């Protein structure tokens, strides 16, 4: 779907890749509903995007609140414009611990943000997409969905679930005008650990241990994928290489990642 003239809803728009998606979309002539928990961060995103009230609608929202999510399509259409493109970008990682040491509270939070919230957003907006005979759903999965990362087993499971959901949705909608895209980012230079409430050295932006794609570059790749209606978008050589390697030699791929990440595992 062409970005110019379209209205996008982007979650996690207050920082990192989400913020860059907003900036890129507005630069391409789109209007954006920017969703994030942090109201101040949304104001900063608006400023960085050089946006005005005609092109930018900030919405401070907890996306795990299913009641508020269900009410979004009518609320946004009434106060702004009907949403054409839904980008489920928001996500969090788990504490870097083994499954046996993962607390139930952390399990519930990761699954709520990474899987249940995107599902509820899809269920909220899909009926209007089908009725209007146009729309695009973009779900941000992860390289972790197909590459085993020690200490991030639940995170990987949540992203694998989202990937499987998106693949099924693509199949269900293949004969409609509603497009579906799964995004598989590799390592992106964002503050995902900090934003997930996790104090962790070596994972966030500025880490020298892992070569990362910039959020700006990642956003450019995603937006280009939307315009070309691509069903799958891989970001970074790491995501592409590990996708192939995991298929060809899963044991070697697991050992390779374990060697890279073992120092982070508590």
Question: How does the language model describe each region?
Answer:
Residues 2-33:
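Canonical Rossmann dinucleotide-binding motif of NAD(H)/NADP(H)-dependent dehydrogenases/reductases
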Residues 39-40, 60-71, 104:
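The beta1-alpha1 cofactor-binding region of Rossmann-like NAD(H)/NADP(H)-dependent oxidoreductases
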Residues 97-99, 103-108:
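Substrate-binding pocket helix/loop in short-chain dehydrogenase/reductase
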Residues 122, 158:
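Active-site helix of classical SDR
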Residues 127, 171-175:
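Alpha-helical segment proximal to the catalytic Tyr-Lys
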Residues 142:
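Residue(s) in the substrate-gating loop at a strand-loop-helix junction
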Residues 175-237:
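SDR active-site lid
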């Amino acid at each position: 779907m062409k970005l110019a003239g379209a209205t996008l809803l982007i979650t996690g728009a207050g920082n990192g890749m989400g913020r860059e998606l907003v900036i890129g979309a507005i630069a391409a002539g789109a209007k954006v509903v920017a969703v994030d928990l942090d109201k101040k961060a949304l104001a900063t995103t608006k400023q960085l995007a050089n946006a005005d009230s005609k092109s930018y609608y900030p919405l401070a929202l907890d996306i795990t609140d299913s009641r508020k999510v269900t009410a979004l399509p009518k609320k946004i259409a009434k106060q702004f414009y009907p949403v054409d493109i839904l980008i489920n970008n928001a996500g969090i990682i788990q504490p870097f611990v083994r499954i046996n040491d993962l607390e139930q509270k952390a399990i519930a939070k990761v699954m709520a943000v990474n899987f249940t919230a995107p599902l509820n957003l899809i269920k909220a907006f899909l009926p209007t997409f089908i009725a209007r005979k146009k729309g695009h759903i973009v779900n941000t999965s992860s390289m972790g969905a197909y590459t085993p990362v020690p200490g991030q087993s639940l995170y990987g499971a949540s992203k694998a679930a989202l990937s499987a959901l998106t693949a099924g949705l693509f199949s269900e909608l293949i004969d409609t005008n509603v497009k579906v895209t799964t995004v598989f980012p590799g390592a992106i230079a964002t503050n995902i650990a900090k934003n997930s409430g996790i104090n962790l050295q070596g994972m966030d932006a500025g880490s020298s241990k892992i070569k990362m794609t910039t959020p700006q570059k990642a956003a450019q790749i995603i937006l280009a994928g939307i315009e070309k209606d691509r069903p799958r978008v891989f970001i970074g050589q790491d995501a592409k290489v590990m996708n192939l390697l995991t298929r060809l030699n899963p044991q070697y791929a697991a050992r390779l990642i374990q060697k890279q990440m073992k120092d982070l595992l508590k």
